[in-house]
């Protein structure tokens, strides 16, 4: 008799995705981040659900409802901080996951890669709207500044912004709709993640060498289930260290001041995971130019597969490309740092140089490095 997990219509899907999945034998810990993102998403949906039970999306009560969750709801404080810091862990895993894809040439799986880019954009939108919900100073002004960027779109810009706001400023209508979108988007992310996985399992996983491993596979369970469990335990350890010891480390103190449209905070800045894009936005003096650069800083990932000029897939055996990759990583850290600094000398020029470098590395230097390596292989 065949095992039920191989015949049952539902269990068969789970079996083919997580148990009997043929997996390359040499995938490293960089391949753990996919499962960690799944865990992060489940954690965010669960904590978010319990927060939504006590939260009110009204400008007069939103701030106090969050305070109520932390003070009066049983374990409300831990749920709130797990949700807030869970978002940070989510983005750490996302950046590592994308970085892995860039380094090992996983972007040659076009459908998987493009759905991944859509997932990244959707997650960024969700996180932005979630940051508005506590209705603190940084929530209000962050929402005002970022939604206002759409007014840079010629002709329809102003109408579009007012349509998103539901009025002539960020107000009750804006908060209510942001809560509605923030609630629904994680489920859309979950659906997209399933499609992401579906396309990945059409081709099978890449591996560090970038060489097809179809002749050499091992079952996902128990080898990678146990490896994933180790990753999950480490993720939860780091998250709980953050939550229990320094819950406000990654937050902004200004968000403990209730939203006040009449008082602008001295430095409006988003959460740390958006700072690199914010730095690129600020580095261009023109409004429309800044918005375009901001959008392109993420959408440039769609171009990466078409800029691949190397004869090899992975960067494992390409030292010049490796140098370019790590310069890009350092550049992104520089942009993240600049995004959190005030707009003054020398930060302005550093931000502008780092922004130019970002696009230059991806569009010019990486393809050039690959071409040089191709020619070196002929010697």
From Swiss-Prot:
Keyword Signal: no
Cofactor comment text: Binds 2 heme b groups non-covalently.
Designated name of the protein: Cytochrome b
Listed SUPFAM superfamilies: a domain/subunit of cytochrome bc1 complex (Ubiquinol-cytochrome c reductase), Transmembrane di-heme cytochromes
Oligomeric form and interacting partners: The cytochrome bc1 complex contains 11 subunits: 3 respiratory subunits (MT-CYB, CYC1 and UQCRFS1), 2 core proteins (UQCRC1 and UQCRC2) and 6 low-molecular weight proteins (UQCRH/QCR6, UQCRB/QCR7, UQCRQ/QCR8, UQCR10/QCR9, UQCR11/QCR10 and a cleavage product of UQCRFS1). This cytochrome bc1 complex then forms a dimer.
Binding site for heme b b562: 83, 182
Function recorded in the entry: Component of the ubiquinol-cytochrome c reductase complex (complex III or cytochrome b-c1 complex) that is part of the mitochondrial respiratory chain. The b-c1 complex mediates electron transfer from ubiquinol to cytochrome c. Contributes to the generation of a proton gradient across the mitochondrial membrane that is then used for ATP synthesis.
GO molecular function terms attached to this record: metal ion binding; ubiquinol-cytochrome-c reductase activity
Annotated membrane topology: Multi-pass membrane protein
Listed GO biological process terms: mitochondrial electron transport, ubiquinol to cytochrome c
Subcellular location: Mitochondrion inner membrane
Coiled coil spans: none
Cofactor(s) essential for the protein: heme b
Keywords: Electron transport, Heme, Iron, Membrane, Metal-binding, Mitochondrion, Mitochondrion inner membrane, Respiratory chain, Transmembrane, Transmembrane helix, Transport, Ubiquinone
Transmembrane parts of this sequence: 33-53, 77-98, 113-133, 178-198, 226-246, 288-308, 320-340, 347-367
Primary location group: mitochondrion
GO terms for cellular component: mitochondrial inner membrane; respiratory chain complex III
Annotated InterPro entries: Cyt_b/b6_C, Cyt_b/b6_C_sf, Cyt_b/b6_N, Cytb/b6-like_sf, Cytochrome_b, Cytochrome_b_C_euk/bac, Cytochrome_b_N_euk/bac, Di-haem_cyt_TM
């Amino acid at each position: 008799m065949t095992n039920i997990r191989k015949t049952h219509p539902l269990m068969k899907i789970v079996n083919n995705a997580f148990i009997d999945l043929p997996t390359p034998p040499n995938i490293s810990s960089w391949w753990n981040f996919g499962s960690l993102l799944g865990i992060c998403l489940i954690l965010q949906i669960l904590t978010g659900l319990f927060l939504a039970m006590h939260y009110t999306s009204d400008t007069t009560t939103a701030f106090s409802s969050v305070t109520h969750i932390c003070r009066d709801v049983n374990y409300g404080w831990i749920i709130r901080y797990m949700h807030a810091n869970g978002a940070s862990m989510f983005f750490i895993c996302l950046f590592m996951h994308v970085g892995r894809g860039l380094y090992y040439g996983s972007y040659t799986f076009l459908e998987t890669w493009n759905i991944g880019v859509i997932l990244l954009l959707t997650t960024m939108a969700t996180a932005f709207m979630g940051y508005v919900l506590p209705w603190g100073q940084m929530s209000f002004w962050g929402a005002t500044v970022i939604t206002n960027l759409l007014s840079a779109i010629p002709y329809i810009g102003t109408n579009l912004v007012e349509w998103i706001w539901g009025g002539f400023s960020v107000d009750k209508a804006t908060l209510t709709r942001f809560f509605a979108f923030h609630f629904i988007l994680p489920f859309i992310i979950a659906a997209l993640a399933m499609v992401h996985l579906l396309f990945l399992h059409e081709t099978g996983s890449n591996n560090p060498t970038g060489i097809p491993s179809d002749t050499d596979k091992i079952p996902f369970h128990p080898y990678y289930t146990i490896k994933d469990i180790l990753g999950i335990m480490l993720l939860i350890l780091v998250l709980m260290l953050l939550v229990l010891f320094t819950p406000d480390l990654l937050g902004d103190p200004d968000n403990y001041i209730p939203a006040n449209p009449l008082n602008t905070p001295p430095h409006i800045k988003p959460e740390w995971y958006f700072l690199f894009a914010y730095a690129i936005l600020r580095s261009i003096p023109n409004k429309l130019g800044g918005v375009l650069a901001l959008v392109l800083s993420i959408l440039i990932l769609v171009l990466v597969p078409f800029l691949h000029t190397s004869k090899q897939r992975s960067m494992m055996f390409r030292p010049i490309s490796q140098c370019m990759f790590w310069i890009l990583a350092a550049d992104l850290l520089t942009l993240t740092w600049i995004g959190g600094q005030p707009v003054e000398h020398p930060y302005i020029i550093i931000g502008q140089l780092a922004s130019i470098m970002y696009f230059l590395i991806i569009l010019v230097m990486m393809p050039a490095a690959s071409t040089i390596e191709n020619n070196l292989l002929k010697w």
